[in-house]
Swiss-Prot record:
It is a lipid-anchor; GPI-anchor. Residues 1-23 form the signal peptide. Disulfide bonds: none annotated. One of its GO terms (cellular component) is Golgi lumen. Cell surface proteoglycan that bears heparan sulfate. May fulfill a function related to the motile behaviors of developing neurons. Keywords: Cell membrane, Glycoprotein, GPI-anchor, Heparan sulfate, Lipoprotein, Membrane, Proteoglycan, Secreted, Signal. Interacts (via heparan sulfate) with PTN; this interaction promotes neurite outgrowth through binding of PTN with chondroitin sulfate of proteoglycans, thereby releasing PTPRS of chondroitin sulfate proteoglycans (CSPGs) and leading to binding with heparan sulfate of GPC2. Interacts (heparan sulfate chain) with MDK; this interaction is inhibited by heparin followed by chondroitin sulfate E; this interaction induces GPC2 clustering through heparan sulfate chain; this interaction induces neuronal cell adhesion and neurite outgrowth. Glycans are attached at residues 55, 92, 155, 500, 502. One of its GO terms (biological process) is regulation of protein localization to membrane. This is Glypican-2. A lipid is attached at residue 554 (GPI-anchor amidated glycine).
Amino acid sequence: MSALRPLLLLLLPLCPGPGPGPGSEAKVTRSCAETRQVLGARGYSLNLIPPALISGEHLRVCPQEYTCCSSETEQRLIRETEATFRGLVEDSGSFLVHTLAARHRKFDEFFLEMLSVAQHSLTQLFSHSYGRLYAQHALIFNGLFSRLRDFYGESGEGLDDTLADFWAQLLERVFPLLHPQYSFPPDYLLCLSRLASSTDGSLQPFGDSPRRLRLQITRTLVAARAFVQGLETGRNVVSEALKVPVSEGCSQALMRLIGCPLCRGVPSLMPCQGFCLNVVRGCLSSRGLEPDWGNYLDGLLILADKLQGPFSFELTAESIGVKISEGLMYLQENSAKVSAQVFQECGPPDPVPARNRRAPPPREEAGRLWSMVTEEERPTTAAGTNLHRLVWELRERLARMRGFWARLSLTVCGDSRMAADASLEAAPCWTGAGRGRYLPPVVGGSPAEQVNNPELKVDASGPDVPTRRRRLQLRAATARMKTAALGHDLDGQDADEDASGSGGGQQYADDWMAGAVAPPARPPRPPYPPRRDGSGGKGGGGSARYNQGRSRSGGASIGFHTQTILILSLSALALLGPR
């Protein structure tokens, strides 16, 4: 044995030693040339970066082994890694913000322009049919469209009041024109309005047109307003949600992920994909918007389908003039019956002296120029678009948004600055401590799974307060859109009192037909208070605007709104309350 010892000593240097372990790149590569090159290009002073590895006992985040970073360099890299992460998150979601903002602008412009087109069409129709008579009373019609725009823009009163006042003013102007031989002082017109607004519906001077016009306009404008508000809410919520605050634990994990390879002198060694996913999911764990985001997108699509279907904004806007014209034709054709009722209730009017008497205006057929828009002739705006095209474009873009928050960590880690390509899983990568393979388990993004995140401590109580508030905003917008799709206004006005609450507009197709059978009348409501001051005249003293087809939310709708508000209140408590 003693004779073999010299031979063993000669062979020992030829035997291979142990393979490189974690941190061995510091022993193999003692130069900081690559780090100096990368950081120098970023504007770092080379005086702060040593040419070779030094002791890392001064480091606070990176492993305290051999390093190329001073304390100042490490702190600067921490700030840069935070900025890189924030920028990637915002860039990943920028298409959401831009898409929702662009769709909001396009739909808003379209709805407003369709109202302008409807006003222009009515002006042309009535100018040709009534000529000078329309010109004398054009302010009534212009006022109607102005108040419709105010309601759509959230600055006007309810549509019931708007339409009731319009029909009242129209009756007060038109009825004297049918009887130029009589004088109708203000007191008599007040009696006329009171009679027309009586709850028994005995006098319907414009037939069923006011009810059908109110039903169409209210359901359509409520839906359009909720839809545009929903797009605006989504844009604001996403814009705020993408501004991710970085906690101290997240900041340190990001530094270990993409900053520490520079300090170890191996900037070309990319972080492992699993390492990146754990860090990013931990940083985003309390700030996702699912599942409320998916429900919000569903609400947009449901309401968009209604707006190009049973609640068609195009057909509603284009039919305003038709419904008003039908009402005027009904009054002319039934003037004898209507006048007899008025004269019986309000008394015979005083005759006009013969020298002041005007000739009656010619009766012309008001609707002769009108032709309904066919499927092949969808009205377009000045921009050459129509609602069908806008909804198709919206549907295509919303499909790309679905699941965005669930995929956000994969999107961020797919950037070359954050992690190695997932296809290179078998190749060595940066594990947080050195070169090798990432062995800890990759956890999911839910709060329950993030409790076991190996890279940073995550609050298991769920979303933070700002995120809960944003999710509640999405829930409120979704509830408003889905309620509008059922023909109701969540803000308090019942937009669909003549249709079933569960049908959401199944009766609406009948309302397009002139002369459609009206649904059964509801129980009479108490008369409305006077809308303007005035002393009593013939037929009674109180004043009341004509209110044909006008109604407030009844008991059924009150229960509907109470239930919806209760659901939102419970959602708020669930989101904002303690976990």
